[in-house]
């Protein structure tokens, strides 16, 4: 069995240590069937092979200065599997309230339950400052996203082994929205530094990989979630400390009181409503015409536009994630109808990587779906992509079927059933025993 190790010369991940854990929930095969039903998941998402148990964990990781800080997360484990299992690390999307973090929603996590039942050991970091973690959440800060994820993988693997389970050395990374950014940050950190983790495949989905260009260009557009901009602003001020001396230098009156709403007790929808209320009542701008730029002091934005060394510009550039070469298979998934995270982020990442990487790299456009609707088809596609690489155990009760498996369905890369099969196109063949083959049909 391959052990997960890390190089002691790389200081960012020195503090990893699980300090407490709690068994939160278990699911029987019948419970998991109910999860499929309640979540409207198609059967081909994954065979229900195992019962599952899930733990909430607290662990030490590093803050932006490299100092130890407590974070929290969740671990889902398939029960009674008979050989070492692959690891799937899920990176969650934008969360403002502590109650929205994975460790606080274990019983409702279809991704964790379904993936573990198929045969993955699933890790989910809350990142810094969310769940029961310490400090302010550094939203879309690549360094601490990556360190929080990597430290949970390292220590989570040791924790899983302490329970008597084994992992097989395969590591799959996927995340959506902010989780796409965190996934890309984790790929970059692992493959650009001397960390002995080997990524089997990754699927960054709908992430803002170009914070300084593709995403920043949306400041002057009507935006479904205006609360994202202050979140980035406050996070980068927390990390770098030089974006402003007084919040009133950046945000117009009334908007400059928003910071208190990012204390972990409010949801993004509540913050959005407050922003739209201020815009309407104070500035006579309705929500259908409001842009993030309407919150920003004119002089601050003018300085940002004219100064190539402006602190906010440099902070955004520091968190761009298209300046490395992926060394493992990667599938970028996004939908061109996304008004929250510009599809141009995925295009820029693909164009930056494609000329140089020698690994499988695919950009999939899910069509004119919005940010929310794109999530399910993207996640299903990522899961099917991983299944073609994963080395699963053969569940005991399926052993008799293995020699007689038969094809039950064919799906495209977004998990949609194929009725008409176009030649020279990638498909997934799902068999009766839950195993998935990746094929190109030629005829």
Q: What is the role of each PLM region?
A:
Residues 17-82:
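Catalytic-loop region of hydrolases
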Residues 139-162:
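Alpha/beta-hydrolase active-site loop
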Residues 73, 186, 312, 328-330, ...:
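Short alpha-helix in the alpha/beta-hydrolase fold that links the catalytic acid
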Residues 63-72, 76-117, 132:
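Short, surface-exposed "cap/lid" segments of acyl-processing enzymes
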Residues 208-323:
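Accessory cap/linker subdomain of secreted extracellular hydrolases
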Residues 326, 331-338:
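Short beta-strand/loop motif that positions the catalytic acidic residue
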Residues 216, 308, 313-314, 340, ...:
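C-terminal catalytic histidine-bearing segment of alpha/beta-hydrolase fold enzymes
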Residues 391-418, 442:
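Residue-level detector of functionally pivotal "anchor" positions at catalytic/ligand-binding pockets or at interdomain
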């Amino acid at each position: 069995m391959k052990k997960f190790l890390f190089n002691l010369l790389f200081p960012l991940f020195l503090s990893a240590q699980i300090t407490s854990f709690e068994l939160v929930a278990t699911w029987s095969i019948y419970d998991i069937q109910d999860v499929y039903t309640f979540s409207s998941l198609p059967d081909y998402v994954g065979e229900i092979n195992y019962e599952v148990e899930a733990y909430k964990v607290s662990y030490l990781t590093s803050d932006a200065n490299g100092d130890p800080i407590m974070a929290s997360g969740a671990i889902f484990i398939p029960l009674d599997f008979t050989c070492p299992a692959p690891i799937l690390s899920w990176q969650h999307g934008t969360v403002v309230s502590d109650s929205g973090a994975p460790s606080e929603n274990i019983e409702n996590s279809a991704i964790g339950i379904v993936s573990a039942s198929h045969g993955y050991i699933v890790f989910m970091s809350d990142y810094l400052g969310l769940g029961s973690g310490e400090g302010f959440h550094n939203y879309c800060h690549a360094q601490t996203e990556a360190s929080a994820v990597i430290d949970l993988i390292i220590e989570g693997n040791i924790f899983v082994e302490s329970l008597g389970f084994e992992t097989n050395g395969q590591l799959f990374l996927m995340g959506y929205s902010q989780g796409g950014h965190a996934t890309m940050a984790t790929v970059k950190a692992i493959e650009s530094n001397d960390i002995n983790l080997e990524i089997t495949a990754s699927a960054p989905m709908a992430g803002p990989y170009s914070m300084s260009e593709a995403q920043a260009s949306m400041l002057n557009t009507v935006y479904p979630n205006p609360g994202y901009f202050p979140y980035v602003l406050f996070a980068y001020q927390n990390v770098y400390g030089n974006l402003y001396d007084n919040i009133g230098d950046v945000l117009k009156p009334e908007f400059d009181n928003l910071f208190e709403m990012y204390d972990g007790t409010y949801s993004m929808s509540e913050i959005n409503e407050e922003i739209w209320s201020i815009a309407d009542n104070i500035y006579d701008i309705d929500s259908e015409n409001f842009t993030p730029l309407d919150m920003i002091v004119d002089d601050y934005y003018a300085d940002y536009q004219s100064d190539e060394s402006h602190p906010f510009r440099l902070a955004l550039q520091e968190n761009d994630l298209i300046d490395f070469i992926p060394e493992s298979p990667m599938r970028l998934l996004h939908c061109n109808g996304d008004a929250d995270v510009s599809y141009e982020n995925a295009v820029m990442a693909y164009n930056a990587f494609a000329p140089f990487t020698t690994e499988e790299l695919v950009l999939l456009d899910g069509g004119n779906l919005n940010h929310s609707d794109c999530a399910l088809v993207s996640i299903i596609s990522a899961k099917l992509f991983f299944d073609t690489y994963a080395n699963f155990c053969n569940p005991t009760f399926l052993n008799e079927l293995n020699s007689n498996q038969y094809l039950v369905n064919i799906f495209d890369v977004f998990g949609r059933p194929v009725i008409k099969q176009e030649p020279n196109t990638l498909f997934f063949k799902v068999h009766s025993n839950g195993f998935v083959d990746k094929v190109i049909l030629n005829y």
